[in-house]
Amino acid sequence: MKTKRFWGFIKDPIFGYIHLTETEKKILDTLPLQRLRRIRQVAGSEYVYPSANHTRLEHSLGVMHLAGLLAENLPVNLQEDDIQSCRIAGLCHDVGHGPFSHVFEHILEKYYHQTHEDLTEWLIRESEISDVIRAEGFEPDRIGKLAVGKLKDREKPYLNQIIRSAVDSDKMDFLLRDSYHTGAEYGRVDIFRLIYTMDVLDNNLAVNLTALPTLEAFVIARVEAFRTIYFHRTGRAAQVMLARALEKAKEAGELEFKTVEDYLDLDDYTVWASLKKCPKCKHIVDALERRQLLKCCYERAFYVKDQLITSLLTDEGFRSNVAERIALKSNLNPEEVIIDVPSLPSVPYHLAQTRAMDIPLFSKTQDGRKIPRKVTDLSQIIEVLQGFMNIIRVYTKEKYREKVMTAAEEVLGRMPVSTEVSY
């Protein structure tokens, strides 16, 4: 920060020492932030990568750190309060996540018509975070909107993009952090070159053309991390089972919340205990505890540039119809067949959420003028990757695997050789 009035520091395995101001320390010690210690970052991935037990708390600290670096290194006239606001927003950007992170998103959308971003704003406005923010001279509503990329600031609209854009502090942190904790190694990208070459172009964050190879590496790393971590077929099996358990628990009257206090009581620990006691879903939790996971018996991957196909695959009615047709051919109850696609709310960090080709690029003339450049004109790699990668999978219990696979091939077509690839 321009005026370094740090309270102290925390040792982080990704960035070394992360400094905190007194304001950030006070916010960190509130219940909404401390609750993030009990919410895993990529719930379900630990069934594939045993060390993937890191939480939303350390991710939030990392986003705070990178948001501050990005803000203070932009060659524009940002005040200390602007930089501190970005850091606070980064620290608080995930407080609205439910138990098991993105796995809970379906419950929020289906039953509460909310997303975790909506709840992030709510908690920043209505919880004790609000009292701390206001006492420190900041406006909770402004911080809440900045944390989810909805701040309307005519003079500095690019502040939103520090937290939420195609190349933001959130994605930079989770790419490095999730790769580190899983051991998948795809996140070895020089994000600091991106940070130090960013500028503001027409009120948007933009990357200097000199950093194009790093930007390409970032986009490729995101694709590979998605395939090998966020949509790994075994990790998704665990997440699908968790999502089904949560659905059954909600139908049984569990997972209710009306107040901030109610919601803050929901974390991985308390909800897991509730699921174990719920007669409707106890058998699912028992299977998870024994790692008796659903089996993927069919998979087809494809790239499309038409988002209509992505929307079709996400449609619950479409997926239910496919599951029923497969179940009928298998002589099974439709409950035994699950269709999974990466654009579902429970899947973290789907590539279609932010498009790499939307990233502004610029080059500089000798007299310092910034010239806009189009990324897809300059990078064949990003041009190729601009199609949305979709994967449709069919899961069932191991004892039904063969007949469901046969039925799925009849309904959806034979599986390509690419399904033999391990991801």
Which residues are covered by each model-predicted region?
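Histidine-centered, transition-metal-coordinating active-site segments
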Residues: 1-85, 95-423
